[in-house]
A protein has these predicted regions:
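N-proximal low-complexity "stem/linker" segments adjacent to membrane-targeting elements
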Residues: 1-45, 410
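Short beta-strand/loop segment that forms part of the nucleotide-sugar
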Residues: 27, 52-65
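Conserved donor nucleotide-binding strand/loop of the catalytic core
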Residues: 59, 70-97, 108
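A conserved acidic beta->alpha catalytic loop
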Residues: 61-71, 121
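Short beta-strand-to-loop acidic/aromatic patch adjacent to the donor-nucleotide binding site
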Residues: 110-122
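Conserved donor-nucleotide/metal-binding helix-loop-beta segment in metal-dependent transferases, i.e.
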Residues: 124-146
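Conserved catalytic loops of nucleotide-sugar-dependent glycosyltransferases that act on lipid-linked
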Residues: 153-250
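Terminal low-complexity segments of carbohydrate-biosynthetic enzymes
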Residues: 245-410
Length: 410
């Protein structure tokens, strides 16, 4: 292994002994001892059930857990012919570095397909392996997940990643940062060749990097209907700030990298792919959201980041300031149209102002929190299925405002 590898040298003999395999199933982890054993054992069952004659290797790339995550992974149930590799990855601490390590092993083993499963999953089933790996064996390059999720789960996806990816590339990939996916041999090598692994791609930016690169550079893309996703969901008010910053900075970086793909008269991305229909009785477990905390972040953040807001929004910053100073919490937040324009303004400002990129992303966080708060309040009496129409409304606003982005970009 070379100096830039995310895989420690002591793993090399095991990789050399295995030599080659058909399918690598990777689980990035950090203190997931309570769930990773279940994920690994279900993955092994699924691999043998659906790909009985294929060589399979399970890989756990861990971020230095102190709860015995690696030991639980090694002790999980698996047929004797399925190899298991567990180690602490090298490099920047983060999910992206873990995935880089998994991809490096998949490349070394010349695996035809690489599947990644989140290590905090409580709803994974054996058929997930078939749904994520099967299309790769059939000739697809990338398989993105499609879940039934609670209306307050996936707020970064619903409010920026999905609408922006759909508007830019014409690709209706419902969960572009879903965490569970299938990747072809060719795309694994494409990812590893990119000079991005010292950026936010090494952290939570990795999922949107993977999806966008797949849209822009690979062949066929599929979506896998995986049903309900039950995992350790996070309150956006309490835990998603750093994740938002890393995802959105990467999203904007990808816009700059692939402007030749999206900034054309007609979108050239993947064709529309079917999503997953939800019945009214499929309501997922609720995800708590601290709305007052989100609103406080919005109000305080608009005051704190006034200079960055002026840089990104120009005269329209005063409109945001007026909304933030509203006396009523019910009136706080941005409409779908306003939010789409704000994101486009920030993307263009991020491109123009290299030296201010960090401050711009920080300034966008409270506006995002205000948007999430308004969406939560609007969806209060809705089922998760009904709330999906609010996401569609947001997507349409991004699509209809795309000419505004093109004008900004020139």
């Amino acid at each position: 292994m070379d100096e830039g590898t995310a895989v420690p040298a002591w793993v090399e003999p095991q990789i050399s002994r295995i030599g080659k395999t058909d399918l690598v199933i990777g689980t990035p982890s950090f203190n997931n001892a309570s769930t990773i054993g279940y994920v690994a054992s279900v993955a092994a069952v699924g691999a043998r059930e659906h790909f009985p004659s294929s060589g399979v290797v399970l890989v756990n790339a861990d971020g230095g857990s102190i709860d015995g995550t690696q030991e639980v992974f090694r002790g999980s149930e698996a047929p004797p012919d399925i190899e298991r590799i567990a180690f602490s990855y090298r490099g920047i601490p983060g999910k992206g570095s873990a995935l880089k390590a998994i991809f490096e092993i998949a490349a070394r083993l010349d695996a035809h397909a690489c599947v990644v499963l989140d290590s905090d999953l409580r709803s994974v089933e054996p058929n997930w392996v078939q749904k994520l790996a099967g299309p790769i064996f059939a000739g697809f390059e990338f398989v993105s997940p499609c879940y039934i999720r609670h209306k307050h789960d996936g707020t970064i996806t619903n409010n920026i990643c999905y609408p922006l990816t759909r508007a830019l590339y014409g690709a209706r990939i419902r969960q572009p940062i879903g965490g569970d996916f299938g990747v072809s041999r060719h795309l694994v090598h494409t990812y590893l060749e990119k000079d991005v692994w010292a950026t936010d791609v090494a952290r939570f930016g990795v999922d949107i990097f993977m999806t966008t690169t797949a849209i822009a550079e690979s062949g066929r893309i599929a979506q896998a209907a995986l049903g309900r996703k039950v995992h350790d969901a996070k309150d956006p008010a309490a835990e998603l700030g750093p994740m938002f910053s890393q995802v959105v900075s990467t999203l904007f970086d990808m816009m700059i990298r692939y402007e030749h793909v999206w900034n054309t008269p007609a979108p050239s991305g993947a064709a529309e792919m079917p999503g997953l229909q939800m019945a009214d009785d499929d309501e997922p477990d609720p995800v708590p959201v601290d709305v007052p905390r989100l609103i406080a972040s919005f109000r305080n953040g608009v005051r704190e980041h006034s200079q960055a807001l002026a840089l990104a929004l120009g005269k329209r910053a005063s409109v945001i300031e007026a909304v933030a100073s509203s006396a009523s919490d019910a009136d706080v937040g941005l409409s779908c149209e306003e939010w789409a324009l704000v994101v486009y303004d920030f993307a263009a400002a991020y491109r123009r102002n290299i030296e201010h990129r960090t401050s711009l992303i920080r300034a966008l966080v409270p506006l995002y929190n205000g948007k999430v708060a308004s969406l939560v309040l609007k969806a209060k009496e809705m089922s998760s299925r009904q709330a999906e129409e609010l996401v569609e409304e947001q997507c349409r606003a991004f699509e209809e405002s795309k000419p505004y982005l093109r004008d900004l970009w020139e």
